[in-house]
Amino acid sequence: MSYKLVIAEKPSVAQSIAKVIGADKREDGYLEGNGYIVSWCVGHLVELASPEFYDEKYEKWRYEDLPILPSEWNYQIAEATRKQFGILKKLMEREDVTGLVEATDAGREGELIFRLVYDQAKCKKPFERLWISSMEDQAISDGFFHLKNGREYDDLYRAALCRERADWIVGMNATRLFLTDTNRRRTAVKPMTVFLFRQVFKKSLSCEYNRSGRKVISYIGCNFFMNSIDKKTW
């Protein structure tokens, strides 16, 4: 009997999918049944290597070593989720698994999570894409009836890679630059203070500017009136 390996983004989603497609036999790290094996990632199982992976000199944060710009990108298995990656890799290598279903979240990050696992495991088996925005039973059933060719989302994967690598370049360099330059200039900031720059930081700063800064800049003064009642007239 041949199987399709379905990979979801998190265990709760995998369980919802397994219930609909009839994979009801629970194993260590996956569910199996009715011609399907359903397993899951736990967030990002594969992540970009840290700077010291490229060169040991980056273990020490030095202003003179910046910027850090890898000529090629390397990835590593996240230590906290290494076991689950191993389970997925073994499932991909099973001879009775003839294809995969990418069931991670329908979006850029979901695409990245699956593809990095797929590539890191050196899997060459064909895969289809489950693209749904609801976890209702009917939506899951309809989604499996209309599975897409996984390669139709190659551009989305490339966009996710660009976002991830840009985030790494900005985050790693800006964090080290701010800390080393601050300490180098002997400002009042404590030596062990660490400022982490990431996309979330930039997005938050942008939101605050849009909410507060632009309102101040575009503010136009105007007259206003207040009503009052003289109690003596009653």
What are the functions of these language-model segments?
Residues 1-181, 195-196, 222-228:
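Intrinsically disordered, low-complexity regulatory segments
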Residues 164-167, 186-190:
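Amphipathic alpha-helical surface "interface" segments used
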Residues 178-189, 209, 213:
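Short, solvent-exposed helix-loop connector elements
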Residues 190-191, 201:
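Conserved catalytic-core segments of large NTP-driven translation/proteostasis enzymes
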Residues 198-234:
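N-terminal cationic and glycine-rich segments that engage phosphates or anionic surfaces
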